[in-house]
Amino acid sequence: MDPNTVSSFQDILLRMSKMQLESSSEDLNGMITQFESLKLYRDSLGEAVMRMGDLHSLQNRNEKWREQLGQKFEEIRWLIEEVRHKLKITENSFEQITFMQALHLLLEVEQEIRTFSFQLI
C-alpha cells in the first residue's frame, strides 16, 4: 500500500475519532468502522495483485469475490454520500477539512480498488 494512503487513512481515522458530531456519535462510529474495513479490503486486494499467482487462491478460497467487490463499491458510494452530507451540514472548519480529506481519500481508494480488480479479472 502506498505510504501516503496509509498515513491518510490513519490521519482521517484519528481526526474522526476526535470529532463529536451534533447528529450522533453512532453515525460517526459507523463511518469509522467502514473506513477501517475498506482499508483492510483495499490492502488485501493490493497484496493479491502483488502476488500474481494469488488470483487462483483468491478464487478458490472465495468464489464470491466478485460479489464482495460489488458490495465494497456500494459501501464506498454510501460512504461518499454520507461524507458529502456531513460536509454540507457541518459549520466547524476542523470537521469540514476532515470530511474534505475523507472524500478525497474515498475517491482515490475507489479508483485504486477498480485498478486492482481489473488486474485480478
UniProtKB/Swiss-Prot annotation:
Under InterPro entries, the record lists: Flu_NS2
Q: Where in the cell is it found?
A: Virion; Host nucleus
**Which UniProt keywords are listed?**
Host nucleus, Host-virus interaction, Transport, Virion
Relate the assembly described in the record.
Interacts with protein M1. May interact with host nucleoporin RAB/HRB and exportin XPO1/CRM1.
Species whose genome carries this gene: Influenza A virus (strain A/Leningrad/1/1954 H1N1)
Tell me, what is an example of a GO biological process annotation in this record?
A: exit of virus from host cell nucleus through nuclear pore
Q: Where is the signal peptide?
A: none
SUPFAM superfamilies hit by this protein:
Nonstructural protein ns2, Nep, M1-binding domain
The gene is NS
What Pfam families does the annotation carry? Flu_NS2
Q: What else is known?
A: Average number present in a viral particle is estimated to be 130-200 molecules.
Family the UniProt entry places it in: Belongs to the influenza viruses NEP family.
Role, per record:
Mediates the nuclear export of encapsidated genomic RNAs (ribonucleoproteins, RNPs). Acts as an adapter between viral RNPs complexes and the nuclear export machinery of the cell. Possesses no intrinsic RNA-binding activity, but includes a C-terminal M1-binding domain. This domain is believed to allow recognition of RNPs bound to the protein M1.
Q: Tell me where the sequence motif Nuclear export signal sits in this chain.
A: 12-21, 85-94
Reply yes or no: does the keyword Transport apply: yes
**Entry GO CC:** host cell nucleus; virion component
Protein name (Swiss-Prot/TrEMBL): Nuclear export protein
